[in-house]
A protein has these predicted regions:
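N-terminal presequence-like segments and adjacent domain-start helices
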Residues: 1-14
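Short, surface-exposed acidic/glycine-rich loop or hinge patches that mediate macromolecular interfaces
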Residues: 11, 21, 49-50, 232, ...
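Short amphipathic alpha-helix segments
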Residues: 11-31
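Hydrophobic side chains in well-ordered alpha-helices
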Residues: 23, 55-58, 238
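Interdomain "pre-motor" coupling segment immediately N-terminal to P-loop NTPase/helicase cores
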Residues: 29, 36-91
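A broad structural signal for alpha-helix termini and local helix breaks/kinks
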Residues: 31-32, 193
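A short linear hydrophobic-aromatic micro-motif
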Residues: 32-36, 285-286
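Conserved helicase motor core of SF1/SF2 NTP-dependent helicases
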Residues: 97-109, 113-227, 231-312
Length: 312
């Protein structure tokens, strides 16, 4: 008789076991030659060695499903243990799944171009108005890379000075000062990763969120690096950021040319970079438009109204 301990890593074991160990009971019923007990993140298995190997493969398939989709239904569980394709796997074009199980994927032609550009290039510029999903989709691509282990970390950054505000004149310590600028990045991550796992990854610096000034002097390797609100960088700041790129790293730079908050809009680093880097191999540029807006339908009308007013 063989005994083995299977350690459940990278996911909350409760998601695998099910409420009241309901999922585990279904799995155990299919392996009558085994005695299975679970405690914490360890499953203790005792019994026939061949059946144990099949059981271990089944547990790994379920773990991979939970890791990918952040959830597993009883129907999915039964499909997996019976060797069938799950409904979730049948959905095409999904980047990752939210913590509620909602598929995050392209919702417009230009969003799909962003995904394609990311897969084909090491550096991508995604430019478009608010609400086009450029930041959210970029973070989803980064989370996917982390889950698939094609990247070891995610680094997210924004310029910390916008709308004429300067950090030195804001109240509180440094974290209090920069967090409001970085909140949109936290919001996207919280939609895609369970809170406990996200907190653990941030404490281990697997996920790093920092203002642009903190990038100086670093070489960013084995990572997906995203710079948001790049239209509010100076040419010197953006050049500094772009040259941080290390081995096995992908960069996504997002920005909205209609929301430049610099004192001199002509001095936007994003405007200059798009001009200077045009046509360089390995750099993709994707332009999103108001047709790609995926927020409330009023957002599209608001953007159109402001554009019409600016033309008068």
């Amino acid at each position: 008789m063989t005994e083995k301990h299977i350690v459940i890593e990278d996911i909350d074991p409760v998601m695998l076991y099910g409420v009241g160990n309901g999922h585990l009971q279904i799995i155990k019923s299919l392996y009558p030659k085994l005695r299975v007990t679970a405690r914490g993140n360890v499953i203790r298995v005792l019994g026939d060695s061949e059946e144990m190997q099949r059981f271990e493969r089944c547990i790994e398939q379920i773990r991979q499903h939970v890791l990918k989709y952040n959830a597993i239904t009883e129907e999915d569980l039964i499909d997996i243990v019976n060797g069938r394709q799950t409904k979730a796997d049948a959905v095409k074009g999904v980047v990752v799944y939210s913590i509620s199980g909602r598929p995050i994927k392209s919702r417009s032609e230009n969003q799909q171009r962003l995904i394609d550009a990311y897969e084909q290039n090491d550096m991508v510029f995604a430019v478009g108005p608010a609400g086009t999903g450029k930041t959210y989709l970029s973070i989803a691509l980064a989370v996917k890379a982390l889950k698939e282990k094609t990247a070891k970390k995610i680094i997210l950054s924004r310029p910390a000075v916008e709308a004429g505000e300067k950090l030195g004149f804001l109240p509180g310590d440094m974290k209090d000062k920069i967090d409001p600028y970085l909140q949109p990045l936290y919001d996207a991550l919280e939609d895609m990763l369970p809170q406990v796992k996200l907190q653990d990854m941030m404490e281990k610096h697997i996920i790093q969120i920092a203002p642009l000034a903190f990038m100086r002097g670093r070489t960013l390797s084995d990572a997906v690096v995203i710079l948001d609100e790049a239209q509010n960088t100076t040419p010197q700041q953006l050049r500094m950021f772009l040259t941080r790129m290390g081995w096995n790293t992908k960069m996504i730079i997002t920005g909205d040319m209609t929301q430049i908050d610099l004192p001199n809009p002509q001095k936007s680093g994003l405007v200059e970079a798009l001009r200077i880097l045009d046509g360089i191999e390995g750099i993709g540029v994707v332009e999103l438009t108001k047709k790609d807006i995926v927020r409330h339908k009023l957002v599209t009308r608001i953007v159109q109204a402001y554009e019409a007013d600016e033309k008068q």
